[in-house]
A protein has these predicted regions:
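Cysteine-centered motifs
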Residues: 22-23
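Anion-binding and metal-coordination hotspots
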Residues: 1, 5, 26-371
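Tryptophan (W) side chains
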Residues: 13-15
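Alpha/beta catalytic cores of group-transfer enzymes, especially the acyltransferase/condensing modules
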Residues: 10
Length: 371
């Protein structure tokens, strides 16, 4: 597999997987030995390193590109073949370095017509055909029918947009919101810990919130690891009475707070009468447990299912969803006309200002009529 990575934070990039092909070219018996050129083969290469090898090879073999032959009836020399192949690898690596630099460390795609845009799945793809289009992730925070804070991000996931939006809110108003209510796209371990650290209550749904609260069969399913009974010795007891013993602990990739998940393996699934309902593979079942995250989920459910939480959820649906509804369907603004992140941000800010002025005028008009 071919991958690129940054070497020690420097402007040099190495190419994994590329080394297998380049090593084959450079270390073949007799390929460069007859020239007297000694080249150290590696599993990783940089464009600068390949250019140096290419230059040394051209100097050693006295290569003149003007004398190269092409087309039918012409037989390339061994030096020309190896030189062109090495040059092809060098140019390809430069191309990949440029593309990965444009992408940056926080995304894995970009549009050729707008390098700041990221390919995302659109809501209008009703049939789920995996239609990916270049887009930006627009985030708003609504209060009293006004757009209080707005942010434009390149992240595909809403979870990654929560912290920057809250920091922007604090930058504007000098404090964090007490009850940041959000839909299931924002509830994650990172965001819950962030709320704890900054004095915010956990009122963001998690991805399985609806299923957890509305489907009794799923919530009370005895074969879910969270419903296993804890044993006195730290094990988990399945419905058949078998013990799940601790196997290992694994860090979650990309988690900024050092979140870890524990894996437990059943001592013996042989002869289990619930095998078809409990597991699919033939080997003993292994489950993943994160007790801290499960406690957070329980706290979120208690918050949102309370009367106060129900009122906050209703208010969010009216204000946040209503704001997008007015902008997209009443004003027919469904697509940005500018490119580049700064220009798109400017356009969204102007639309938001227009929305707030519209709301302000309506409120004054209603107040005047009521008076």
């Amino acid at each position: 597999m071919t991958q690129l990575r940054n070497v020690g934070g420097s402007p040099f990039w190495s190419w994994y997987g590329f080394g297998s092909r380049c090593c084959f070219l450079l270390s073949r018996s007799g390929v460069l030995a007859y020239t007297g050129l000694k080249v150290e083969t590696n599993t990783e290469y940089t464009p600068q390193g390949l250019e140096m090898i290419l230059g040394r090879y051209a100097f050693q073999c006295r290569i003149d590109e003007k004398a190269f032959v092409h087309g039918r009836g012409h037989r390339k020399t061994r030096e020309q073949r190896y030189y062109e192949k090495l040059k092809e690898y060098t140019e390809k690596l430069k191309e990949y370095v440029k593309k990965i630099w444009i992408c940056g460390p926080e995304r894995n795609s970009y549009s050729k017509t707008d390098h700041d845009a990221t390919f995302m799945r659109m809501k209008k793809d009703y049939m789920g055909n995996d239609q990916l289009l270049p887009a930006y992730n627009i985030q708003i925070g609504a209060a009293d029918e006004y757009i209080a804070v707005i942010d434009v991000k390149q992240y595909r996931s809403d979870m990654d947009c929560f912290v920057p939006l809250m920091e922007k809110f604090r930058e504007l108003y000098g404090f964090y919101p007490k009850y940041p209510v959000a839909d299931a796209g924002y509830g994650s371990y990172n965001n819950y810990i962030y709320c704890q650290e900054h004095g915010m209550e956990k009122y963001m749904k998690f991805p399985m919130y609806k299923k957890e609260t509305k489907e009794k069969e799923y919530h009370e399913n005895p074969f879910r690891a969270v419903n296993f009974k804890p044993g006195p010795d730290g094990t988990l007891i399945c419905p058949w009475g078998k013990k799940f013993r601790f196997a290992y602990r694994k860090a979650v990739k990309g988690n900024r707070y050092g979140r870890q998940e524990e894996y437990y393996t059943c001592e013996d699934c042989g002869g289990c009468p619930y095998k078809e309902q409990c597991k699919k593979p033939d080997k003993n079942r292994m489950v993943c447990v994160n007790r801290e995250l499960s406690c957070m989920y329980q706290e979120v459910v208690e918050n949102l299912e309370s009367i106060h939480g129900a009122l906050l959820r209703m208010n969010r649906s009216i204000q946040a969803e209503g704001t997008f509804g007015i902008i997209k369907y009443d004003r027919w603004y469904k697509r940005v006309v500018r490119r580049k992140l700064k220009r798109v941000s400017l356009e969204i800010y102007l639309v938001s200002i227009g929305h707030n002025l519209y709301k302000f005028r309506n409120k004054r008009k209603r107040a005047a009529i009521a008076a």
